[in-house]
Amino acid sequence: MMTEPNGPALDALDGLSVGDALGAQFFVPETARSHFTGRTDPPGPWPWTDDTEMACSVYAAQRERGTIDTFDLTHAFALRHDFDRGYGPAANRMLRLIREGGDAKALAAELFDGQGSYGNGAAMRVAPLGAAYADDLDEVVRLAARTAVITHTHPQAVDGAIAVAVAAAIAVRARTGTMTPETFLGEVVFHTPIGAVRDGVIEAIALLAEPDPLVAAKVLGNGSRTSAADTVPYALRCAARHLTDYRAAVWEAIAPGGDMDTVAAITGGVVASCTGTRGIPAEWMAAREPLPGWAFPEPGGVTGGRGRADMLVPRSHPVPDVEWTDEQWQRLRAGRHTDTLDHRWAVHTHEGSVRICRPGGGHPVWEVAVTRIRGGRRPVSAVVETSHHRWSVLPTDPHGLTTLSWILRTAAAGERSALRP
């Protein structure tokens, strides 16, 4: 069950974004020389980077629906992609192609000669999700993995996202009691799949007593390779050592150089999950560039689909010539259409696809994949149930395409109209 959207999840987003924005200041050599040694604050404002932009999309998605719709989140990443926020070349290309109608799953899977990205991008954005589902660590693991593979399909990247999300969830739980750094990281190890990230967190436990961050980073990494395995263990070590001291944790995250904005974002998101926004220095919050307004949609403004069993015999179906404005798409997503459709059809969305069922049946007759276009959405593919054991439509039946087109137009318009055939 998701926590209050203005509670730990927002705390994690604030902590992540402040760490990201402060860390990014130290890529400027003059700032690094003049401010780091004395730990004095660089002059504001501090712009945030791609770390925060993507984390805002994660936060907005779960705030709006009360869960994560990976189709919508994928296209939110692409729609809000700002080239100047510091995305890597592979991410820039992939998000641009998704925005132009490319297959998101195929684009993510083909990165790095088909291995998928093993970078730290999935880990850097996930703390608000972990904080939101702190009551259910199994759900944290499941959702962290689902949101990771949108852009990062390599197991190391997925494991990095899981480790950070679990750490944020455990940090929320630590608000009501005390937790040693060893216990904190031990819980992360327990829930992280076997692999390089988990091994790194185990090494981080062994280095908790090491006072010199440069020594620890030499073993664990500092994000300079931009891989999850080179980033997550050190970031979580900083969080574990200073779980109730946001300032100390973030300064330690920045200390060894490397991918300073991302390491500080991960550390800051986890620590603020424990301390709350009140634990973040007020002057740092004031210096951080304000978060975008789109990150704060109306809570619960869109409800999820009802869920259903899969089709028995799906077949490709002609794609209706239909386009929806953004307003019409929101009406479709709200899922209240049976009265408009003469109580013969129920329409809802699930992970961005439109599903059309008989009321009370739950089994889809059609499922229509949708992509964003300028000013709205349009269908890009459709499948239909052809099993004789259920209400079925033959793909070659022209009446089927007519009916599907009528359903999609009428449900989006919200006004009853006659089905002529």
Regions found by a protein language model. Give the residues of each.
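Structured, active/binding-site neighborhoods that engage oxygen-rich ligands
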Residues: 1-299
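Negatively charged, low-complexity tracts enriched in Asp/Glu with abundant Ser/Thr
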Residues: 296-351
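A structural detector for beta-sheet-dominated domains
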Residues: 348-350, 371, 385
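Canonical SH2 domain fold
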Residues: 353-372
